Amino acid sequence: QKPNFENKQVAVVGTGSSGIQVISQVAEEAGKLYVLQRTPAYTIPLQNRPVDPGHATKMKAQYAELRERQRNSFSGFTLVHSDLAPPPTQSALEVSDEARRAEYENRWASGGLSPYYAFTDSLLNMESNQTLAEFAREKIRARIDDPVIAEKLCPQYPILTRRLSPETRYLEAFNRPNVELVDLLETPIHRFTEQGLVVGDTELPLDAVIFATGFDVMTGAMDRIDIRGRDNLTLKTRWSEGLTSHLGMMTEGFPNFFWINGPHSPFYNPILLAEYQCDFICDLITDLKADNTDLIEPLPEAEAQYVQLTNDIGNSTLYPQSDNYYMGDNIEGKPRNTLFWFGGFPFYRKQCRLARADWSGFRVE
């Protein structure tokens, strides 16, 4: 049942992706909305729009080419304005200011995740990254009436190192008279009271509090299943000192246990990744059955090599330059590791093919 916030005093804690979606809607309903922000988010207009029937027909005719491009692309995202787009070939610093801005404007108008791959080095070079970051901050300032509020909503960390959040009417919410931004770095939350929340030295009278404080990415859901491996070892205990895996699909000590779209998997189109990993696992099982074997698990040394490669790739990017869930920073006590494979899908596929060539990185019985 949809909650009714009409004439209610509401607080939303958190301005990540979930908070942004909630705030956009609740701002239009609540009598008063307090937005409790610790870290501002880079946002991009979602640009949802009706699909023209002619465009749908065109895309279906190009479907084979689209999938081929996606399977050979770094991230699996190859559309701009819902049409096929070539992969980037240049640094953001190799083009003129005018050409760079035109590219950013084009992708901003496209919406969604289009800016991720405008140039080859947006996540590798800080100077290149900051050209996009300042462009995004300009877009934020242009939509906020109060310049003080606008600056509080402008992130300063490298763009794309935290999730880029598509939105509709989010920034405009802060122009409404019933919406108040509370900067938790200036006035932190102290406690709940019977009437609401105390932030700084002020008590906010509230009818409802909505927590949009994120979740334990990649490992959290698997931890909660209480998966147990050899010697009754739990997966949560196995990963308590840092994430380990081989090929982002299995881990030593848990024979015949596979996952898809999980820890250490590529930052890639999740539909195509699930398809590839399912095929890999099914082919592996078929080969094992043909050889009359019924157990497989990674060898410790093979797993260590994959983990090291994953972390080395992650450390070569800008992701470690901010606190983010890609590195596990949003969960207190979680070891800081690269949780995703950031080396692109073609290189990941090469690792999988090498592993399957002779199974030398696995214990097979």
Where are these regions (language model features)?
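Aromatic pocket-lining residues of Rossmann-like dinucleotide-binding sites
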Residues: 22-26
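N-terminal FAD-binding dinucleotide-binding subdomain shared by FAD-dependent oxidases/monooxygenases
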Residues: 1-8, 15, 20, 30-365
